[in-house]
Amino acid sequence: MSPLSSRNSFPEQHPLFAGFLPADREKIVARLAGSDLILVLGAPVFTYHIEGHGPHIPKDSALVQLTDDPAAATRSPRGLSIVTDLKLGIGALLAASAPSRQAPALPGRPPSLPQDRLTDRFLLQQIAALRPPGSIVVEEAPSSRSAMHDYLPMLEPDSFYTCASGGLGHGLPAAVGVALARPGRRVIALLGDGSAMYSIQGLWSAAELAVPVTFVIVNNGGYRALDEFAPHFGLATLPGTRLPHLDFCALARAQGVEGVRVTRCGELDAALRMAFAATAPVLVEVCVEKNG
């Protein structure tokens, strides 16, 4: 899937699903190494957090893009871009396709995690196990995004939303909006602690509108996603990215939203079940391992 994809367009438990591309030019090239053809359907080529260096795709790979957006076609740095109706274009491809060799085997799903470490991966696993049928995930937890595809896969259309540009603070108010647009469905807002602080006042709107949103705060004590950028700036770590002593439950209660804090694996399931069953907004602050 394209980097920073804002919705789910492929079932993530399908045997041919191989995850999302990172929003990093060098990592994209490494991930796509060995590909004869890169086929991009309805997505840009490609979106990055920062521009990066070197080629955009492996040197021995061909690229074909099908898009209904002429602007996306003009921005594509390599390959052939075709502006077309996607339904008609994909239909024509399927009618003409005849693979000449067997695709390589794909890695299997990771094993189930035990209840011994409260990591973001364990949290995602338990959300996947306990989420109500038909629920919608609105995500702004960038440092946990790659783990989501293994431990919290999206299986249905209209079940996942996030910000395509990586904008800061989008997730919390977006979850309120999705709940208003999809009445009767459970909305789960998966938010990093840093992301949530950009728009924490959205909890007041959730309380006033009485929307059934479960706000899950992945509290790792800082802007962990930014730490990955440090090498690009010639630094070991970035200053000003730690967020100690935040009390999200107190912030929630001050705005009329019930809050519960989870610090141990054994507390997690009960907190999630309570929040998923509530008819009003609930915030669950999960204090995960800093480097888990």
Labelled PLM ranges:
Residues R185-S205, V218:
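DG-centered beta-turn motif at the end of beta-strands
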Residues S6-P11, F46-T47, P70-T74, I90, ...:
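Short gly/pro/ser/thr-enriched loop/turn and capping motifs at secondary-structure boundaries
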Residues F20, G34, P99, A230-A271:
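Conserved thiamine diphosphate
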Residues M1-V64, L155-G184, Y198-Q201, H232, ...:
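Glycine-rich, anion-gripping cofactor-binding loops and their flanking helix/strand elements
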Residues E12, A105-A179, G184, G234:
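Active-site diphosphate/adenylate-binding microenvironment
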Residues T84-I90, Q201-N219:
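A short alpha/beta connector and helix-capping loop motif
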Residues K59-R145, C265-A278, V282-G292:
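Phosphate/pyrophosphate-binding active-site segments
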